[in-house]
């Protein structure tokens, strides 16, 4: 296996046995591909914006004299880059310009002749752009558009499962769902009549819509029924026989032909009778005359003499009618065939309750349902019906809907029109009747073949189309009313409706969400999330159990583990690792093709619809060296069921053992040993892990860590290979390999690192280089780590030495005892950055002012502010400190003469303003790390703004000049190469200035051409950097676009350092969560025979009932990994030779049977071996992939190799007494996470504060600075103790006795600790409520 530069530094031992046939796909492709499709310009296959424009344009005027045509569109360049948009609170978007052509016609006779055309480029608003990491910056905030799982358009057959009526009768229904347009429902009622509903309105007999489609009664009956022909010969009635139709009937007469009795009267007609009739080729039998009585005629019969109707179609034959038919000379009578078993006469019965008789009546009936109260006219009724299902403007099944529709009706043709046709409606009714007759099955609505993914591009296109349709109406009106000779396309188009529709979607849609940026995993998971909620989806209140449940088709497409706990369970899911959406939006998963029992490496992606036809083997099926199945019977899946199949029946095999789970679940080692509920918690809690100061890779991982870290975008990845030419904390420069460099470029790649940026969750984003000067890197190598990554691997927590044992009750109920060493070494210390904003507005009384001159504030409070009233960078602040001084004008009050005199004597300042400064919130303390000031355009900037501006300009100039120097240096190196190969002496060359080199004239024309090209590049480079500097200068010095009424915004960024403390929540990766109960001194912690204390003590009772045994296996394997590291460390300390280290590490890497990982350390140089050993001395990282992990034997072997007991248990000694514990204890290394549920964010203290308006009781919750509720049960507790005075105090002066608490406050100030309880306000409220019921209660003194 070839390792990249970063991987060589620290190779993770892989215990996986199954070969990795398919690489993990790019994890953000669902977002990025969808948006690329949205903005892709492809006239051949229009999609996204192109499709939206084509569906609305051309727009014709009502009179047909003018037409506005679409030619093409173009997206401009964004004004600000991503970082600038985040700082300024702007949207990262590009202007959309559309080229339109206005054609004006002149009528000549019946034809229109083009009189004039005007072509123009029109601005149509801004389109938000996706960043490289699949997010959008909207108003400076990073957001994610979550994909939606919704019911696919098409036709669906369903039943009520007998729940509608008390009789339990199953009522079947069909629904045609378009992508856009009216829904069409067909449903049976209790009497087996068939009805239709349009858009869930009042139901109509189904024959109404058939008549509206211009079918007559005869045609309707002929479409839905087979006919039976009776012949009358010599007063004898004969029936044309089709034997199959008799199956299951009871003979009401002897069925005999030529004296041979086939079935006796009263006998049930069975299969043997039908076989005999067929064998003897009986096609006609004699039946009694009364047999035809009650049968329904299939067409009209008229008197042959008078032409008066004897019987109309769909009428039952009576003896009189039969007599008239015979008398009129009819020799054959046609009736419709039906029976009670499998040919119901539902349409015939429905025709009888249908009051309409022709097309017009039917159209009027539909019009009355759709437009109740409006008088119907023939034209209006026809127009409405035509527009409902047959107009491309109003109705669209879409290619997906048509494909599903045709598949459901077993049609050969997959794609067709987007509107409905007559045959479509008839075929749906036919299939529904067949299902009612017991032929065919209803659809499973939770099958992933019936639910599709709607991603960001598609949703944005729909929203854009809504905006375009609004514009279309306005354009039509303007074309009809305006003077066409003067109008231009620009005059016709108003971009505001389009911008508003797009902005509304990105800012306020339920699926446009504030990105979860806790750590790289939470970012990736959020982008791969699939929600069944949102517009056009389900609501959590109405969603039942079935839709939330795991479905067999979820296999390899949607993760069965990762879903939230609570009301959204099962409605919000996560995409599986290898899943992708196909062109129709259905989820596909990859499989290896199996041919004649041999598994190939040929990969096929199958959707849930296609998968149902195949037999699919699991990924952990045993194969021999050439890919044949070892076992004759193989466990496989087919049509949603698992079973054993012969190996030659298998069609496909899973690609990987982890293809069933999502990214988060695939990061849990030994997932196969955890209970599903705990695995769900583990997957969810990894997303809440806070990035700590020093990230540490997990000793026991799954091999997915690198893919997640790279795809999340938090690391910096080398775009091209080369040599590290320069590296510092904020910049990495790579001199690119010659074979990867184009001739017309400098061959230098500069990577700027992100430093101490605030994330959406207030965690700190900081990138650190992980390469050194002069090192070689290749394309795709990680060159800088981001938050929660370590050498290019995801590192959410820390490896902790843990012991499973009780310890003085401190680990009761999932609590954890943590060693002081963890705090001292800052293992779980994290930095949180808070953004506090001060806004200066223009009020009615005058503008608010940001100043250091604040009334009634002492000098000490102002000591950290500069003269502009803004805090210094680097200031240490605590709760209540002023960050930005601001005064707001208040209404002038009338002063008494005494006050005027005092004002004149003492000169009290600023009486007409009040203090509205920005202060540090209570309970927060930290360091000011940055201040940003935004001033409205046209307002003079204050001194601090100008200082910040000059610093920014200085920094930009420095960065750009350094970049220029780097590029110049590389360019002059190439110039030097050209000159030296031309024979110029190196010594002479370096005696002249570098700029003079460009003026030299060479004799060789080819070398002269190369020199002139490099000279051109040099001057282009200079020009480009000057232009860059000019653009940056303009951006920095220009005023800011602020909302109306806002003059200035000051943003202060505080960095808060949070050490771990009791009350903080921690968790492992197996759903084993708990709260820290105590930080224990190191000397009191249990320790082993070598004197090494444990870091965390966990409760062993937390394992058996939770059934997450994975944590125990992780602990043992972690111990073994650390043991290997300790041995390597010992060898390094002993200065052993590289060969000895190589042999030992090779032995460790080779351990395990049938491992897919083959490492040859002989190919590593001694320097690489030493570097690898240094990185392994804290423990050898191990990968144990899900469902393909390390076995118990392998863990024991690794423990033996590291010189540890194979039981994984050791004797511990009590740190307090020094005595050994009676029994051995499981000790090992577990990867622990600090979750973003910190006690500092949850706890607060209140003495006085705000009160509820009605009850006058203190508010609740930290956000309201509320108090702790003393509830009913707490009152009982005090009653039980008989603490009456304490109880009285709690219920009166400490709660809602307004007068009592005011007196109490005064008494405390006076030093008098007496209280006088009065009447609680809540009692007064109770009195008022009783009085509102007209019961008067008065209190006696």
Swiss-Prot record:
PROSITE patterns for the chain: RNA_POL_BETA (PS01166)
GO annotations of cellular component type: DNA-directed RNA polymerase complex
Subunit structure: The RNAP catalytic core consists of 2 alpha, 1 beta, 1 beta' and 1 omega subunit. When a sigma factor is associated with the core the holoenzyme is formed, which can initiate transcription.
EC number: 2.7.7.6
BP terms from Gene Ontology: DNA-templated transcription
Record-linked Pfam families: RNA_pol_Rpb2_1 (PF04563), RNA_pol_Rpb2_2 (PF04561), RNA_pol_Rpb2_3 (PF04565), RNA_pol_Rpb2_45 (PF10385), RNA_pol_Rpb2_6 (PF00562), RNA_pol_Rpb2_7 (PF04560)
Classification via InterPro entries: DNA-dir_RNA_pol_bsu_ext_1_sf, DNA-dir_RNA_pol_bsu_external_1, DNA-dir_RNA_pol_su2, DNA-dir_RNAP_su2_dom, DNA-dir_RNAP_su2_hyb_sf, RNA_pol_bsu_bac, RNA_pol_bsu_CS, RNA_pol_bsu_protrusion
Function field: DNA-dependent RNA polymerase catalyzes the transcription of DNA into RNA using the four ribonucleoside triphosphates as substrates.
GO molecular function terms listed in the Swiss-Prot or TrEMBL record: DNA binding; DNA-directed RNA polymerase activity; ribonucleoside binding
Domain of life of the native organism: Bacteria
Signal sequence bounds: none
Keywords: DNA-directed RNA polymerase, Nucleotidyltransferase, Transcription, Transferase
Protein name from the UniProt record: DNA-directed RNA polymerase subunit beta
Catalysis: reaction(s): RNA(n) + a ribonucleoside 5'-triphosphate = RNA(n+1) + diphosphate
Protein's organism: Blochmanniella pennsylvanica (strain BPEN)
Organism taxonomic ancestry: Bacteria, Pseudomonadati, Pseudomonadota, Gammaproteobacteria, Enterobacterales
Homology family: Belongs to the RNA polymerase beta chain family.
Broad class of enzyme this protein falls into: transferase
């Amino acid at each position: 296996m070839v390792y990249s530069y970063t991987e060589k530094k620290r190779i993770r031992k892989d215990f996986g046995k199954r070969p990795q046939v398919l690489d993990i796909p790019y994890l953000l492709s669902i977002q990025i591909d969808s948006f690329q499709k949205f903005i892709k310009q492809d006239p051949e296959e229009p999609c996204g914006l192109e499709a939206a424009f084509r569906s609305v344009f051309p727009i014709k005027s009502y009179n047909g004299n003018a037409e506005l045509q679409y030619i093409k569109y173009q997206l401009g360049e964004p004004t600000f880059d991503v970082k600038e948009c985040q700082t300024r609170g702007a949207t990262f978007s590009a202007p959309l310009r559309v080229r339109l052509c206005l054609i004006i016609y002149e009528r000549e006779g019946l034809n229109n002749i083009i009189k004039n055309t005007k072509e123009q480029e029109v601005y149509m608003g801004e389109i938000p752009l996706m960043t490289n990491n699949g997010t959008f910056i909207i108003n400076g905030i990073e957001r994610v558009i979550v994909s939606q799982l919704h019911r696919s358009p098409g036709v669906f057959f369903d039943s009520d499962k007998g729940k509608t009526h008390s009789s339990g009768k199953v009522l079947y229904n069909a629904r045609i769902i378009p992508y856009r347009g009216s829904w069409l429902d067909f449903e049976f009622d209790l009497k087996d009549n068939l009805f239709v509903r349009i858009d869930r309105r009042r139901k109509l007999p189904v024959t109404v819509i058939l008549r509206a489609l211009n079918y007559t009664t005869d045609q309707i009956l002929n479409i839905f029924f087979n006919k039976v022909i009776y012949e009358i010969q010599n007063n004898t009635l004969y029936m044309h026989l089709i034997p199959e139709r008799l199956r299951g009937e009871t003979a009401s007469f002897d069925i005999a032909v030529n004296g041979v009795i086939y079935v006796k009267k009263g006998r049930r007609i069975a299969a043997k009778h039908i076989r005999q009739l067929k064998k003897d080729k009986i096609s006609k039998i004699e039946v009694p005359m009364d047999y035809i009585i009650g049968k329904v005629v299939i067409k009209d019969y008229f008197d042959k003499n008078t032409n008066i109707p004897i019987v109309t179609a769909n009428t039952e034959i009576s003896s009189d009618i039969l007599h008239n038919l015979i008398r009129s000379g009819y020799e054959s009578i046609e009736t419709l065939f039906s029976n009670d078993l499998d040919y119901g006469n539902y349409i015939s019965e429905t025709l009888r309750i249908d009051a309409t008789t022709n097309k017009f009546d039917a159209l009027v009936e539909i019009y009355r349902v759709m437009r109740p109260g409006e008088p119907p006219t023939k034209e209006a009724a026809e127009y409405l019906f035509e527009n409902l299902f047959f107009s491309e403007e109003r109705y669209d099944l879409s290619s997906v809907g048509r494909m599903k529709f045709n598949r459901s009706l077993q049609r050969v043709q997959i794609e067709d029109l987007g509107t409905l046709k007559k045959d479509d409606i008839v075929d749906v009714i036919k299939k529904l009747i067949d299902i009612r007759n017991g032929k065919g099955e209803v659809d499973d609505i939770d099958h992933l073949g019936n639910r599709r993914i709607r991603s960001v591009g598609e949703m944005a296109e729909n929203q854009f189309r809504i905006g375009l349709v609004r514009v279309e109406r306005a354009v039509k009106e303007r074309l009809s009313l305006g003077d066409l000779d003067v109008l231009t396309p620009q005059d016709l188009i108003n971009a505001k409706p389009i911008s508003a529709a797009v902005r509304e979607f990105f800012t306020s849609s339920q699926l446009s969400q504030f990105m979860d940026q806790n750590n790289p995993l939470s970012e990736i998971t959020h982008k791969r999330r699939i929600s069944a909620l949102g517009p056009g989806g389900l609501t959590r209140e109405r969603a039942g159990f079935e839709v939330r449940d795991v479905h067999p088709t979820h296999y390899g497409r949607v993760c069965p583990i990762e879903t939230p706990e609570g009301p959204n369970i099962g409605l919000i899911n996560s995409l599986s690792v290898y899943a992708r959406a196909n062109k129709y939006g259905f989820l596909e998963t990859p499989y290896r093709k199996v041919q004649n029992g041999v598994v190939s490496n040929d990969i096929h992606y199958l959707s849930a619809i296609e998968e149902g036809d195949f037999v699919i083997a699991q990924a952990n099926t045993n194969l021999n060296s050439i890919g044949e199945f070892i076992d004759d019977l193989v466990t496989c899946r087919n049509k949603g069921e698992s079973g054993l199949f012969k190996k030659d029946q298998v069609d496909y095999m899973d690609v990987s053992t982890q293809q069933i789970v999502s990214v988060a679940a695939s990061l849990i080692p030994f997932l196969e040993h955890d209970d599903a509920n705990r695995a769900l918690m583990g997957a969810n809690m990894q997303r809440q892990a806070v990035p700590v100061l020093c990230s540490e890779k997990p000793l026991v991982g799954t091999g997915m860590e690198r893919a997640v870290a790279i795809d999340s975008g938090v690391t910096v990845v080398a775009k091209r290979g080369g040599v590290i030419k320069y590296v510092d904390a904020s910049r990495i420069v790579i001199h690119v390999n010659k074979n990867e460099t184009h001739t017309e470029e400098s061959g230098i790649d500069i990577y700027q690192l992100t430093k101490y940026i605030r994330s959406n969750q207030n965690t700190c984003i900081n990138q650190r280089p992980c390469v050194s000067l002069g090192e070689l890197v290749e394309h795709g190598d990680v060159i800088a780590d981001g938050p929660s990554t370590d050498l290019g691997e995801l590192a959410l927590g820390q490896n902790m030495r843990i012991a499973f044992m009780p310890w003085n009750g401190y680990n009761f109920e999932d609590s954890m005892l943590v060693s002081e060493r963890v705090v001292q070494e800052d293992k779980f210390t994290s930095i949180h950055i808070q953004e506090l904003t001060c806004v200066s507005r223009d009020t009615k009384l005058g503008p608010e002012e940001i100043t250091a001159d604040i009334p009634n504030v002492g000098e000490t409070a102002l000591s950290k502010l500069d003269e502009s009233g803004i805090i210094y960078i680097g200031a240490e602040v605590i709760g209540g400190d002023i960050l930005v001084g601001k005064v707001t004008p208040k209404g002038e009050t009338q002063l008494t003469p005494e006050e005027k005199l005092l004002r004149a004597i003492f000169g009290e300042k600023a009486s007409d303003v009040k203090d509205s400064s920005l202060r540090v919130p209570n309970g927060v303390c930290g360091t000011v790390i940055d201040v940003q000031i935004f001033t409205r355009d046209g307002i003079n900037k204050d001194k601090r703004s100008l200082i910040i501006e000059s610093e920014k300009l200085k920094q930009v100039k420095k960065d750009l000049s350094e970049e220029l120097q780097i590029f110049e240096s590389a360019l002059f190196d190439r110039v030097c190469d050209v000159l030296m190969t031309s024979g110029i002496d190196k010594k002479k060359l370096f005696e002249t200035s570098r700029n003079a080199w460009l003026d030299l004239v060479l004799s060789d024309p080819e070398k002269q051409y190369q020199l002139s090209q490099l000279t051109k590049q040099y001057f282009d480079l200079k020009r480009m950097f000057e232009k860059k500097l000019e653009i940056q200068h303009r951006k920095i010095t220009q005023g800011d676009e602020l909302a109306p009424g806002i003059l200035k915004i000051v943003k202060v960024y505080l960095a808060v350092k949070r050490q771990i403390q009791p009350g903080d929540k921690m968790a492992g990766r197996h759903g084993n969560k708990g709260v820290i109960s105590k930080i224990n001194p190191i000397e009191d912690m249990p320790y082993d025979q070598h004197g090494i204390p444990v870091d965390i003590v966990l409760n062993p009772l937390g394992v058996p009932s939770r059934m997450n045994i994975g944590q125990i296996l992780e602990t043992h394997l972690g111990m073994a990994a650390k043991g290997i590291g300790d041995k390597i460390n010992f060898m390094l300390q002993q200065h052993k030779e590289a060969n000895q280290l190589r042999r030992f590490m090779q032995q460790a890497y080779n351990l395990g049977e049938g491992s897919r990982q083959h490492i040859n350390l002989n190919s590593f140089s001694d320097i690489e071996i030493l570097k690898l050993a240094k990185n392994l001395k804290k423990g050898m990282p191990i990968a144990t992939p899900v469902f393909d992990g390390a076995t118990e034997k392998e863990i024991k072997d690794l423990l033996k190799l590291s010189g540890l007991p194979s039981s994984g248990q050791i004797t511990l000694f009590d740190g307090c007494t020094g005595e050994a514990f009676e029994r051995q204890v499981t000790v090992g290394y577990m990867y622990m996470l600090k979750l973003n549920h910190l006690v500092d964010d949850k706890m607060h203290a209140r003495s006085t504060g705000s009160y509820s308006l009605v009850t006058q009781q203190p508010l609740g919750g930290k956000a309201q600075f509320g108090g702790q509720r003393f509830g009913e049960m707490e009152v009982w507790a005090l009653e039980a103790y008989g603490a009456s005075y304490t109880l009285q105090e709690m219920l009166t002066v400490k709660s809602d006795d307004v007068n009592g608490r005011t007196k109490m406050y005064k008494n405390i100030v006076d030093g008098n600790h007496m209280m006088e309880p009065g009447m609680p306000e809540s009692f007064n409220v109770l009195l008022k409520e009783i009085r509102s019921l007209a019961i008067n209660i008065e209190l006696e003194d």
